[in-house]
């Protein structure tokens, strides 16, 4: 028996909030290679989400939502500096956990940055591959496949 159009859509969509997407987010996925993480962010698309992969100046890998929380500029064009990734438009600085470290242009006594968090996902590196986990906490252990270790 063939699937209806609606059933096919439900089973094949992997975006956030879809049945397939919510199931697949509970696994680790390869998102890049360690040697790609030089001093520039790298744009990625995983499970229907636009993301940016980078390595900060403390050698930590990070995976953030692609678009700046402030004005929606692509962080693919950001600069890796000062412990995070700085947006090229207004200079907001994000660390690998999505925490906002600096908000240039905001009043010095503003606490706005403390109430806002940028989308960020867990990453781990194994055998030169960067893996990402987009699901809810707690993340499962990253499988140690025998071909990788």
Predicted regions and their residues:
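A boundary/linker detector
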Residues: 1-23
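Rieske [2Fe-2S] iron-sulfur-binding domain
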Residues: 2, 33-149
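A short helix->beta-strand "capping" segment at the edge of beta-propeller domains
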Residues: 26-30
